[in-house]
Structures are given as C-alpha cells and as structure tokens.
Amino acid sequence: MFAFLWKISLCLLVLGVITGDPQAVAAEEKQAKDASPTPQLGVWQFASPSLPPELRKLHGIVEAEQVNRHLLRRRKRSILFPSGVKICPDESVEQAIANHLKYFRLRVCQETVWEVFKTFWDRLPEREEYHTWMSLCEEGTMSIFEMGMNFSQSEEHRSLIVKKLSYTKEAMAGSCTDWSCGGTPTPASDADATTLRDAAANVPPPHEVSIESPPGGTSHEIEDADTTINNEIKKEDEIPVRPVTEQMIEFSIVIAGEKYSEELSDPDTAKYQLLSEQFVSQIQNVFEGLPGYKNIHVLEFSSPEEDSGVEVHYAVTFDGEAISNATWDLINLHSNKVEDNSFMGIEDNPTVVYTISDFQDYIAEILQKNALLENTSLTLDPNSLQLINVKEILHPTQEDPSWITEHPTVLEHVEFDDNTFSAERPSADESTVSNTLPFDFTKPDSTLDSEESDDNEIRPRPESLDSEVSLIPEAPLSSEADVTSLPDGLXLADWNQTPALVTAPVIEHDSLDSLEWLSAPDSSDEFEDTGLSDDFLLPSSPSSHLVPEEPPSTDDYTAPLLSAPTVASSSVIETDTKRTVTAEKEVVTQGSPADSSSADSLLHEXVEESPFPLEVHPVEGEXDIYLGDRMIFDDGSGSAFDGSGKGMEPSIWPWDVATLEPVFYPGPDSWLDDDNDSLPFRTEDIPEGLILDYILNSGNKLDDDPSKDENEGVASIKENFLDESEIFVFPETTTQQVPLLQTGEPSSVETSTQMETLSMDDDSFVKPSFVLEPPEDYSFADLPTGEDLFLPHSTGVSVEDTLLTSTVTLGXEDSLLTSTVAFSVEQPEESSVGQEIISEAXEHQNEDRPTVEELFTAGQSNVGEAATVGYLDKSSLETVLTAEPFEVSTDTSTEEQQSLDSSLADRDTGLAIRKPADVWPTDRVLEKTLDQTVQSAVPTAAQVSTAVPSLIHQATALEGFAGQDGTEHDTHVSMSISTILNSYVTITADTVELPSHLPPMTTTVSSSVVTLAKVGDETTRVLDVSVDLDHVSMVSFSPEPSEEAKSMTDSHMELTTHAHSTEMAGVAWPTHEIHNSTPVPSRALVVFFSLRVTNMMFSEDLFNKNSPEYKALEQRFLELLVPYLQSNLTGFQNLEILNFRNGSIVVNSRMKFAKPVPRNVTNAVYMILEDFCNTAYHTMNLAIDKYSLDVESGEQADPCKFQACNEFSECLVNRWSGEAECVCNPGYLSIDGLPCNSICDLQPNFCLNDGKCDISPGQGAICRCRVGENWWYRGEHCEEYVSEPLVVGIAIASVAGFLLVASAVIFFLARTLRDQYTKSDTEDSQGQGDSLSSIENAVKYNPMYESDTTGYSHYYRRYPQLTSYSSTSAETSTDYSSEEIRHIYENSELTKEEIQDRIRIIELYAKDRQFAEFVRQHQMKLL
C-alpha cells in the first residue's frame, strides 16, 4: 500500500514540473533545432585563402531563416510557373513578387557557385562547400566578383594552371602563331577561335612510353613534362608526348552551274583536271584561315540525286593538334548540312566555341561572301555542304629499322589505357586496334628518292640467308612500272578493311610516294627491266612464302616481302601449334629449324584481341618487321575511347600472305572407274583435260625433305591436297560456248584455326549439296546476314573500259600446256572482245596508261606456274558504273611452252581493274547489281554452269594453306568485297584438248565470293566473307532468287555473260555504329534518345502528363533541347518528350526529321547530346549523366525501351504507326498516367462484405467472398448474401412451379384434342341430315306435276350447293339432275333405299366429274 502511494506522488510531481515550465522546455527544443542547421566550416575552408572571415557573423541570420523555413507548411497546392517559381494560392501579389526575386537570387547564386568551382578548380563542389557558398551568395555577404577573386587566389587554382600549362606545352610542341599568347586576351570568334581551357582540357597527361625493339634496335623514352610556369607556348626541341596527328576531313558540295558528264568520272581527262583546279583554287580560300590547314584534294565528281549540278567529294588535311580535340570530337562522326544558327547566340551557350554548326556556318559564310563579291569562277551551293567523314593519322617517331618478325613491335598510343578493351571481346569479324604497316604518306614536300624510301625498307637478317635464294635489301626502281604508291595524304583507312589482295593498286607517275619492290634476282633477264622477280610474293603479313626454282640446300627459306597498302596487320596471335606438311619443291619455312614449333595462326574474320600496349617480343631465329613512321587509327565505336575522344574502329582485318600456285594432277581414279552417278555427267561425256587448282599457300611451315625427287614432291602435294582438303580454284572463262564441267568429287579439310570463337563455322556457310554430297542439282546456300558479314569500311571502284588478263602457264610431266585467259569488261561502244583479246591487252599497255605487272611464280624444272595480274589507274573511286550492258568474254589459246620465262616475257597481259590516281578513304560502299538474263543453251556436249559472282574490285585476300603433322590442312579464304557486281554471270570454259596420253580431266570451279544484293532495290548489302573451306567450297548465293536462279537448282542452265546493269546504290556506313542490322533498310525519320538528370528529384506528379509539374518540366526541356538540335541537325522537325522515369529524372524523348537521315545519325545525335550535357552543366545547372545517354534510330530501336512500363504492364507496339504504349495487365489500372497498379490497391472497396481482393494472372482481379456455416456471399464483388434456408425454399418453390407448369401444359393439350374430336363428329352428323332432307325435298317437290321450267328452277333454287361442287356448267348439272329424277319417278317400283342410293350417286355425279364420266362409260357399255 505504501509503495502504491509513493508511485502516485512521484507521478504528480513529474506532472507538476512539466506543466509548470512549458516555456523552458520549448526554448530548449527550439535552441536544439536552431543549432542543427548552422553551417559548419570544414578543414579545407580554414586552410584556403578564399574563405572570408565574415562567416562567423552569419549565425543569427541563418538561424532565423532556417527556423522560418521549418515552420512554413503549405496547405494548398502551389502554382508552378514555367520559370520554376511556385506561388501559393493564398499569397498576395507582393509576396509573389518577393518569391520571384528570391527565386532569381537562388538561381543566380546556384549558377555562380557551379561556375566558380568549374572555372577555377575544375571540379564539382562538395555538399558542405555548396551550402556554404550558397549561403554567402544569397545573403549578399560576398558578391560574385569577390567570390571569383578568392577562388582565383587559391592554391588549388594555381596548381591546376601549372599542371595544364605543362600539358599544353608538351602536347603542342610548336610555336604560338595560331594562339593568343600573353597580353590581354581578345574575344574569340565563332569559327576559328578557342580558349586556353579548350585547348588544354583535352590534353592527356604525359606518359612514359617504351618501344619494344629487337636486339640491336634502339628504344626511346619520352622525357618528363616541364613543370615550369610560363604563359608562353613555345617550341620545345623534345620528343612529343604522342605522335603528330593529321586530320583528314571529307566534304561534299554541289557546283550549281556545272553539268555532270562521263568525262568527270575519269581523273585523266582534261575536263576533270580543269574542274579540279578551279574548285581547289576557289575552295582553298575557305580553309586557309583555319588553323592547321595543309591542303585540299578532290576525290571524285558525281551527279547529285537532284541531277542539278555536279557534286564534288573532296578532302581537307589539317594539322591534328592545331584545333582542339574537343572540336573534332563533335565534328568527327557528324554529317549534316548547314543550318541557320542565328538564334543560338554566344550568350546562351558561352562554353561551346567550336560546334558542328559553327564550323559549317563558317565555311558556308565564306562561300556566300565570295559569291556576293563575284570573285568566283564556280557557283557553289553553301546549303549543300556536307561533312562526310573525319580520319586521324598518327605519325610515330622515327626509329632505326628492325628486322622482319612474325610478331610486330607496335608503338603504343599514349592515350590508350591497357584496360580499355579488356571488357569487350571482338565479334567474329571485328578487331579493335588498327595498326598498319608503315608507308611514307604523301606530304606536300615529299619527293620520290631513296632517302624517303629508307624508312620503308624491310631487311632480312643476314644469318637467315642460308638458302640459295639471295635477297637484296633494296631493289632499284628502274622503270615507271616499278612504282606502287598512294595519292597525296592518303590514309590507309580503306586498306585496313580490305584484306591482302592478289594485286596492288597502281597510281600515276606523278604520285609523290612509293613502295619498294623487294625481289630476288633471277637467272632470266626478262625480269630485270621491270625490277620484279619470279619469286615475288604478294604482300600481306610478316610471314610469307615462295617456291624456289631449284631444290634448296637447306631446310629454310626466307621470303622477300613487299610493303603494300593492302596490309592490315593487327594483333598477331602466337600459337603453340606445330603445323608441318611434307612436300617437295613447294615447301617454305620461316626462321630456323629450331623455331619451327611456332607458326602463324590463320585468322578467320575475328582476331584475338591484345590490349594496348601491344608488346611482342621477337623470337630468336625469326625475322622482325619494323612498323615505320605511321599508325592509323580509325574513328571507332563502343565504350572504348582514347584520350582524344575518338573510339577505335572495330574493323581491322589481319590477313596472311597467300600465293596462288597452279598445280596439275590427273583426276582421281574413282571418277573413272567407279560408278559416277554422283557426277552431273558420265565419264564418257567428259573430254580429256586437266584439273586446274590454285593451291592456297600461306603463312605456314612446311617440312622440306631434299631426299625426294621432284615428281614425288608434286605427287605428295597432289595427294595431300586432294585427299584432305577441298579444291579451291578460280573459274576460267572462254568466249566459245563450250560447257564448264564441274567436278563432283568432294574433298574435306579439317580446320585448326586458333581462335576463341568462330561464328562463321556454325551458321555462316552451308555447303552446297553438290560439293559435299553428289546430287546433280546446284542449290544456293542460304547465308546469314549478321554483323559478322559486314565490312565496316569498304571502298568501291567502278569499272569502265577495263581489262583483266590472266596468263596461266601449265606444265605437266613431259608436255607443257599454256592457257591464256582474258577477262574483259567493256563499254557498249567498244567492239566485243574476240580472239584478239591478247593483242588488245597489249594495245592498252601501249597507251598513256601506266601499268604495273605483279608477278608471282613458282618455277621448277618440269612444272612451272605463273600468273600475271595488274591494275590500271584510270578509274576513280566510287565512280558509278554506266547503265549500259557490258560483256565478260574470254579467249583461250593453247601453244607449246618453250620455257616459263620466255612465255611470260612474250605475253604482256597484265591489265586489270583500274585503280584511280587519287584514291581517298571513304565510308561509302558503291554497288552495282546486274539483271540476270537466262538463256537456254543447246550445247553439243553436256553442259552445266554455276552462277559465279563477278568481282570488279580487287578485294580478295587468300589466307593460305597450312598443314599439321603432314596430315591436316587448314585452308582459309578471306575475301573483302568492296564493289561487287551481283551478276550471276556464268563463267564457261573450254575443255582443252590434250594429247591422248594425258587422262581426261574436268575443270573444278569454286567460288569463294558471296554477294548479296537486291536487284532494283535502292539499298544493298556488301558482305565481307572469310570462307572456311571446311564448310564451303563453292557458294553462289542470292537472298531472293529470281525465277531463273530457282530453276537452276533443278535444271542446269547456262547463264549468258551478257548482263545489264541497274541503278547503283550508295551506302554510307557509320563509324561508331555496331553493324548488327542485317539489311540496310530504308532510313528512318525517328530517333529515340534518353538522358538522366542527376540533380533533380523525381516526384509522383511527373507520371501524370496532365499535371502542372510534368508540363513545366516538359516545357523546360523542350526550350533547352529544341534550339540546340535544330542548329546542329539537318532536317530536324520536332522533339517529343515521351515520359519521365524515376531514377533522379530520366527523360525519354523522340525526335522526328522532315526527311530521311543518314545511317550514322545516331552517332551525330549522341555527340550533340553529349555536348549539350556539358553546356547544360555549365550554364543551366543541369547535371546530366553523359554515360546514361542512349540514342537509337527508329528503324532499329525498340520503342518499348523508352516507355515507362513497370512489371504490371506490357508494352505493345502499333503495327501500323509503330507507336508503343504501356497496357496494364488484367487486374491493374493506370490512373492519371501513373504506372500500372493493382486494382485491389487502387480501389479498397472493390470487394464488398469483407471480401478479399486477389489478382489472378491472365484473368484480372477476383474477389474471394466470405463463407459461413449456412450462409455465404457471392457475386463479382461479393455483393449478394446467400443463406442455406433460403436456398432450400428456393429449390422447393422451383420444383413446385415446374410441376404446376407441367400440369397446365398437359391439361391444355388434353382440352385441345377433345375439342378437335367433338368438332369432327358434329360435321359427320350434319352431313347425313342434309342428305335425308334433300330426298324429302325432292319427293315433296315432284316436277311431274309442274312445268319443266318451273320444276327445274325450283329444284335448282333449293339445291344451290350442287353447282359449287360441280366442275361442269350449271346447265349440264341441271339437265343431268332432271333426267335422273324423271327416270326415278317413272320407275316407281324402286324402293326407298334404292332411291336414296340413286340420289347419292347423283350427288357424286354432280360433285365429281370423273365419277360422272365413269357412269356414262358404264352405261354405254351396258347398252
């Protein structure tokens, strides 16, 4: 009890303390609250001189304002102005004005704080820093300029300036002629000015780069950066941090006053040269004012789509470091026309000096000024100016030449990170790094002398020259035909994508650069004039091989290499696989015998990627290749970017050297002896002939056994190649209509390519049935058209008046056979190529067209092979093929061969498809599809032909043939198709008549070229195919075969070699776009993009598109983005904000264009939006995450990706409009644009009477109603109450009702039936009464006592019904009745019954006419 009282007293005491001094408690709470938001100074603030001492006096003011903020409570929904100011409805006008002023001060202070940190300290403020400086600015304690002064005097700002100045000096390494150094800075112009920050912000920090060199070489190290603080950017005599770069920008513009003609497609014509000079002299004035300008070159003239004027495709070369990298990052991947940018003032976008539109506006403005001043000879259309592409060329530092090696030493690009590409694996056709064998690119002051060619020499090591084939370090260029060079300023971007070709381009004599021909001396003198050797091999990769003339004395050969522009050597994979094949006389080894374990790896479409720096250590006994003075880096894609902001192109193709070695052997005996049902024709139909196969001999090691004789060596090669590899040959053609016989004996090859993945092995090729299996039909293999079949950068070469002549000298055992095959592609005005094709080829050489013959031979005592392939330099790149038909005709002649060298010397047939004098890299692929004409042929012998696509551009690289343990052959054929005439022209060949002692042979035709084109379609596809002979030996593919093509699968037709050309389609490939689109569809008009704003909070109101918050934010982004996009994108029409999503704020938008846009518009939009992110951060306090940018073209994008659909909704795309919308799943609703939510949550009273709401998948919301012992609720919403007694009563009532209804129905039916019976009985009784009364009436009215007329009339009146039953007339009935009645009364002896019977008969007589007729006949018979 005492304890209980003590507790009560204690509670009273505590209550009294609380109620007695509430003010003190409130004061303490208030003090605690006010103390919490006081700004705290960090350590950095006291250490920095930029902090003012006035901060200590602000506590009172800040506390009061914080208290007021905490006490304010908004009761009603505020009014949101478009500017962002929110006004409460109960505020007065003065308060609203004060709120605007307060909001203005807040925005100005925000901008000031962001800008001062970004400008002086180049970083974002921390949270405490931001709040501190914001409070200073809002209270007016410190002005904007005072804040800038404090920041400019801080130590952090000074160290930042020192660091960036040191970077700038090392990066520039030049004079200050193009920069404003010292003195008072002047305002920069829109076109050619930049700031120090722009120039230095993109310069990476210096790196120390070590260059791996073989023994005897030298290595250079980059000196450390000079950290001296100096405002001068002066020339430093030091090695630059990174190689000097050049920018090559390609433009196109239309000359309005000119008319396009065919002469402008030939660079050698006078009109082409005159127009080029006029154009260069006029356009040169535009670019001379730009910093770093070097020269201008005209690439080509073409006819625009509008057929008005002449479109000029030209390239401008700049010094890459003269203009900031940020400028070229914006321009690089953007191709747009000039737009009016007058509304984009510098005050709205102060940080963007070089934008795409500014650069183009500058050029267009000068063109317009020149046109107004009438200082022009050509009328250029500034509105047609279009930027095509940007290439960057790097110049590595000079080094001493190294030796040939299988693994090249690569200069490290200082801006590459080792881990840049570690997160990505290349696809089957992509590599990530592009480094090409060096060539001394054309410079304005370059000359064609030996000093310049020293850098390109490739010298073998002296110790490796242990074979009889001697090599010279340098071959003299004795004639014009020796020179193979590139045009001025040519970057090898195109050659990176084209594999090693069987031929090299030949440029005019006035080209400034050259490539040396390294060859071995030959015993014959015929080759000395040209500087070429029969041991010459095609240039490609470090490992190359040749076949010696005589048996070697040792096991090793060292083959000479030629630096050719067709080499694209990327990261070389070193494998541990030993590949040896026993062969004689055609065996090539590389390095010493001790190093035979290391071999080349055959790269098939994909390259195993090596991240930078690519340091490959030389192997003892091998030769090293030194990469000369340049490395090429294409603009690329993906997430890998180097320091200059340029991604590296994933389109580099490593190729191996391949030589075509004709080998002759008789056909297998099984063809002649066994049953030949598998062949298209019987053996008796096959004339005698030889099988001509080009063995693909590539970078592989073959064991040489000198003990075997020559015949055994040839036999071993023949046996191995026939037994374990598929035969790959090129088709030979003739002008005569002699059938081309296909070999039906397939052979297999077992591949051993060392690769991570080989997608082409699984799905890229399907072997035709007639190669792997012996049916007689020739089916078209369906090929997938994925990204692994696309060539990212291809060059197209048109063909006009070209001649391809191939001389093949064949020899077998004791008899020598020479077969000269000439391919010609002619214009219609020329005569058809007939039997004089070889002489015509010689005439082409005698003209003023420089020609180079590239010879590759493999000679032996009895077996010699030779092939001559050359190039003309007459056509220009991407020249459109004429629409007239051309012919592909051949001529085959046979003669006795006296010697291999004399045969080749007598035949000057080396003309091939022409290469232009000025060839420039381009992203455009030109294709010409040819209509197929099928002509039925009735040959004298059995005929069969295979549609073989015609190649009109040199774009083939053969990766040769390797063996492992003498049994396995690995044959790869890689082909890069730049310009393909998809003409299924049948190549027919004569079967050569041979002496009778030679066995009959057939010609094996194998096509490794796959073309894919749509005839008549505006869009075409170019495939880059690496053909694995384990999967395919012959492929002739058409995506949509015509009727002729389909019929070829069933019957062997012969296609004529006369094809008609159709319209050529040009495809501009993107440089940052992954080629995952199989076709090139019609270009879309819609581009989707999304971006994330990180400094804005998301609210639920932003889901509702009708809410003021949504409309205000939508209007704000439209005002920001639309002018920016209009100024930088051609044809921009409108921008639509699709929605806002949570995640800070994710803005999903869709822009539309007024006309089709280039395929790489997504890259341009990405770069523009990235620049917008930077601008918005600087000027509008919008922190946009650049890494969240997502841009997709409407034709490839998934519209659902940009819809804010949650897990309770499904995105559906309208089939017709392509619009996507979120449709809620059954049981879910979207209210006011909010994400779909459950009906159970949105409608709490969905289920009544305590029912439970549940979502059934696929059915929607259902209610689970309550159930009791003898009651329950039912209905869709549990609205009906049901009890057990009620159910029983309802059941009883239902049964009773049913019985009642049934009884009623039965009663009604019985009543009805009874009535019917009663009625029928009544009718019968009435009928009998009528008959009796009629007799009485007849007796009563006896006509005997009346006159006839009276009697008749009475009788007739008393029986009127008789007339209704009689079918005769009334008179006839009356007569019969009167006669009968008279007869009855005259014979009175009849009884009463008889009289009644007679009366009935009379009635029947009167009623039924048939009965009356029967009675008459009966009476007549009785009479």
Curated annotation (Swiss-Prot):
Region Disordered: which residues?
Answer: 423-469, 522-559, 577-602, 886-907
| Location of the SEA domain | 245-358, 1083-1196
Regions crossing the membrane: 1290-1310
Q: Per UniProt, which keywords does this protein have?
A: Cell projection, Disulfide bond, EGF-like domain, Extracellular matrix, Glycoprotein, Heparin-binding, Membrane, Repeat, Secreted, Signal, Transmembrane, Transmembrane helix
Which interval of the chain is the signal sequence? 1-27
Q: Where in the cell is it found?
A: Photoreceptor outer segment membrane; Photoreceptor inner segment membrane; Secreted, Extracellular space, Extracellular matrix, Interphotoreceptor matrix
Q: Which GO terms describe its biological process?
A: visual perception
Carbohydrate-modified residues are: 150, 325, 375, 676, 1128, 1142, 1160
Cytoplasmic-facing ranges:
1311-1423
The reply to whether Secreted figures as a keyword in the UniProt entry is: yes
- In this chain, the stretch annotated as Hyaluronan-binding motif involved in chondroitin sulfate A-binding covers 265-273
Q: Where is the composition biased (Acidic residues)?
A: 523-532
Question: Where along the chain is composition biased (Basic and acidic residues)?
Answer: 577-587
Q: State where it is primarily located.
A: membrane
Please give the tissue specificity annotation from the record for this chain: Expressed in retina.
Disulfide bonds, paired cysteine numbers? 1200-1211, 1205-1222, 1240-1253, 1247-1263, 1265-1278
The protein here is known as Interphotoreceptor matrix proteoglycan 2
| Protein's organism | Gallus gallus
Name of the coding gene: IMPG2
